[in-house]
Amino acid sequence: MKKILAAENLSYSINEAKLFQGLSFELHEGNALHVLGSNGSGKTSLLRIISGLTKPTRGIIKKYNTKNICFVGHKNALKQYLTVEDNISLLEVDKHIDLNIFLEKLELNNLLDVMVANLSYGQQKKSALLRVFLNDSDLLVLDEPCVGLDKNSKNILCSFLRDQKEDKKALIFSSHLSLDIDSEFINLDKVTS
């Protein structure tokens, strides 16, 4: 399997507080990494470092065979003043994907003309997850992807992520919930000083 990413001796601090230090791991195509830890342990910071949105205090991230990374964080990155359909039109959609299948599965097909600001939190979360479903990325980085989702939507998400692994894509996600996805684990509570 091809190596997608390697973290070498990563450390991250905010002011004087060390969130984690000396963290090293590799991720290969078709593998998943579940990041665990208590609130404030640095899960979101680690995912942002992996995505290139935040710099580590120390250490490096090496990316191999990675042309595109898709990050979905707590803030859903949707344009609140646009409709769901307008937000979708801003994406580079993989041409082999039938958008209508995902809209129907996520129960968004009747909400295309609704402004994002008028959606519930769960509906906004599902709209943001469309980025993952429609994007042709080598590495999917998801920060608490199940927060705000109902059971059916969680099952759809897990099924999709399992399919992505089979398609040789790499996954990194944080979740307080156990997800039905075969993955390795990093517990940030065990890599702090």
PLM segments and residue spans:
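Catalytic Walker B motif of ABC-type/P-loop ATPase nucleotide-binding domains
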Residues: 140-144
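Conserved ABC ATPase "signature" region
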Residues: 97-112, 133
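Conserved ABC ATPase signature
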Residues: 115-122
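Q-loop/switch helix immediately C-terminal to the Walker
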Residues: 75, 80-98
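Helix-to-loop junction immediately C-terminal to a conserved catalytic motif
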Residues: 51
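Hydrophobic anchor residue at the start of the ABC signature
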Residues: 129, 168
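Conserved structural motif at the start of ABC-family nucleotide-binding domains
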Residues: 5-7, 19-22
